Amino acid sequence: MRTIFLGLAVGIGVAALGVAVSGQTQARQQGGGRTEPPTLEQMRRTVASLKGNRIATPNDYDTLTSEQQAYVRSILTGPRASITGPLGVMMVSPTLGDLSQRAMAYARFAGDPGFSIVPPKLNELAILVVAKHWSAEYVWNAHHSYGVRVGLTPAVVEAIRTGTRPAAMEQDVEAVYNFATEFIATRSVSDATLQAAKLALGGDRGVVDLVGTMGLYQISSMMVALDRTPLGAGTKPFFQR
């Protein structure tokens, strides 16, 4: 719980400071990166495509409140350029959703100017550890392939999926893996684990950014768990094999 609350505090603080959501480099790599405001028709189509499972996500743009419409516009103008998973769930609470999606963009597009300074490889490692902890199929599906694309080995990703310690890790990967798994398991980190993480992440800010990412993705995992958001058609579960 400490991780969740610290992550939320970091995220809301970032959003309150008005961190610019530009992240175009990684956004393009991940299928996003809109550079112009969405049209009314694009917003209507996006909302019409939403389908909550246990949470009644609205799917008629013309019935949205002004806050919900602003939430849709903000996401579609940002680096994601789409509303999926936890962002759809949070449509029912648009103020929380908007604060969260801005902070989550700060975390997700790590490495781009104005965003988290955590190297993308290590950022994705922490996200996958959180997804495994929560058995968050939706979050895992959104990140496991990208983790490999930014430098994690398939063996490390597969070990996290199966809940085993990776047999061989680079020094920075091992430091962040130890930090993330120890923090989640014990709600604390030893001095030695913290110091190793600081070396891997470039100091205090890197560690704080990493914990913010972990907290924010615990929120994401909880939202999709609340809704029991399904995987796409034809996608097999990752944690029930």
What function would you assign to each model-found segment?
Residues 7-18:
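Bacterial N-terminal signal peptides
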Residues 170-211:
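Acidic/histidine-rich alpha-helical segments that form the ligand environment
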Residues 117-126, 209:
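Alpha-helical scaffolds flanking conserved acidic
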Residues 18-29:
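Signal peptide processing junction and immediate N-terminal pro/mature segment
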Residues 27-117, 241:
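Mobile cap/lid helix-loop segments that border enzyme active or cofactor-binding sites
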Residues 1-4:
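Positively charged n-region of N-terminal signal peptides that target proteins for export
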Residues 198-199, 206, 215, 223-241:
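Acidic, carboxylate-rich catalytic segments that either coordinate divalent cations
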Residues 122-160:
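Mid-length scaffold segments of soluble, non-membrane domains
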